[in-house]
Amino acid sequence: MSLHYTLSVVQASKVGSNLPKPMPPQIEESLSGSDQSAALWMGMAKWFGEDIRSVLDKIRTISFHEVEEIRLRVGQPLLVRTSDEDIFINREGKVSSPDQAHIVNREDLACALERMTHSSVYAAEEDLKKGFLTLPGGNRVGVTGEAILQNGQIQTMKHISSLNLRIARDIPGRGFKILPLLLGTGGILCHTLLISPPRAGKTTLLRDLIRIISDGVPQLGFRGQTVGVVDERGELAGMWQGVPTYNLGYRTDVLDGCPKASGMNMIIRSMAPQVMAMDELGHSDDVTAIEDALRTGVRILSTAHASSLEEALVRPTLAHLLEQGVFERLVVLSRKHGPGTIDGVYDLKTGRIL
């Protein structure tokens, strides 16, 4: 099965022989302010070809810490998205109107894909079929184009037209605020589901909770737990050649790039975790795997896309798990006051807001 990769041929000089290395989430900590932002922009720019890289390297008026997405669309202006606005960028790296911004062309996308797949687009075919790539460090790249179907299933993609690089953030400490609300009788972690719409910080919060649960919290009398993480899309740990980019704790074992359903069974058999963590429940196979996992006594910690309990209940997979009483706590996140805003923590057994 081959990927019909129909973008223009990329010159070696455009891609460069030294492909990007993973960028740690705390890159250039010795720098501060604008210098640190510039260093982070340069680190991210390495994933792109010469033209886009030149633009991003020049950015000085937009703090990298505020950026959530970098979007490339063929024939459209280069766009940087923050939490509250869309910003168009010209060839000098300055904020501009759409008609004065750098216009993305097919070669810009071709160069970026070559670098993001380490010059092996075919090796990334399975991810591209799902519509995304995951870069070292947990940064995720959405991909759209023309889907090629076989028996109603996407087999490949051609004429790639858009890339959306979503920048992963590691914000330690947020989990401390809600962990006490997730503990039940005897200080045992409750089966917990975190829900939010896209870009509202549920993966960031899940990552922090994993680390805290793994390390333990002496102040709460909460001992560290063995945590098994099934990181299907590579966003939680940001694994690079077997080493996690993000700190997930002393007692955490990560299964990277494996479908959640088969991964849960595998990690339970091999690592005997006390807590099983995963991102973005949604497939029907996930239900059976979670029900099997519960029989072993493992605690479940997961996320899903939904903006409210009512919305979650109209999604078949989530509705089944919620109606069966699998989850004991529900954490609802939003962007009301920026990503990671906690709208409420609910005790699903009593219906109370904690």
Please provide the spans of the model-predicted regions.
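Conserved nucleotide-binding/hydrolysis micro-motifs of P-loop NTPases
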Residues: 140, 147-150, 170-172, 233-236, ...
